[in-house]
Amino acid sequence: MRSILILLSLLLTIAFASASFPYQCGPYSCQFGQVCRIDNGVSNCIPINDCHEVSLSTKVVGTWVDGSRGNKRFTQYDITITNNLNTNIKQIYIATDYTLRLRDHSNNSIWNVNLLPNGILTLPSYQPSINAHASFTFGLIIEGTQPANLNVLSVSF
């Protein structure tokens, strides 16, 4: 009985780790705090602090209280993705978490970016890449005044 409990605990731990860090990076699986870096089809996981190819910056556009929404406070942000490379970024995936509390789930609360069902942000179809040393900006409106936690999950160039 004890060995069954140990086995079940081990399986639950593996399942939890797999559910928490499911991001596949080619033949690898990146862990929390890592970025999947894909250079000409070659994938590897690198520490997020070593990912200098791309950067995210957040700028507050404005904050207000909306009486029509129960006097809740909302903040509009511009998020700029900057390509620091000498080559184009072909695709980027940006992770979000519970701090992405959109005002509502419409194009009025997030624009110039695709929000996938799993909460990951990607470039929209009309912006298939980010040119070398260029930037791309998207916007969002969230409840409260704390910016959403956004982290580069994967970058392909």
From Swiss-Prot:
Keywords associated with the record: Developmental protein, Differentiation, Secreted, Signal, Sporulation
Subcellular location: Secreted
GO BP terms, alphabetized: cell differentiation; extracellular matrix organization; sporulation resulting in formation of a cellular spore
GO molecular function: extracellular matrix structural constituent; hydrolase activity, hydrolyzing O-glycosyl compounds; polysaccharide binding
Keyword check for Iron-sulfur: no
Signal peptide from the UniProt entry: 1-19
Gene3D superfamilies the UniProt entry points to: 2.60.40.290
Principal location class: secreted
Alphabetized InterPro entries for the sequence: CBM2/CBM3_carb-bd_dom_sf (IPR008965), CBM2_carb-bd_dom_sf (IPR012291), CBM_49 (IPR019028), Dd_Spore_Germination_Stalk (IPR052879)
Gene Ontology cellular-component terms listed: extracellular matrix; extracellular region
SMART domains attached to this UniProt entry: CBM49
One Pfam family here: CBM49
Protein name, UniProt field: Stalk-specific protein B
Organism: Dictyostelium discoideum
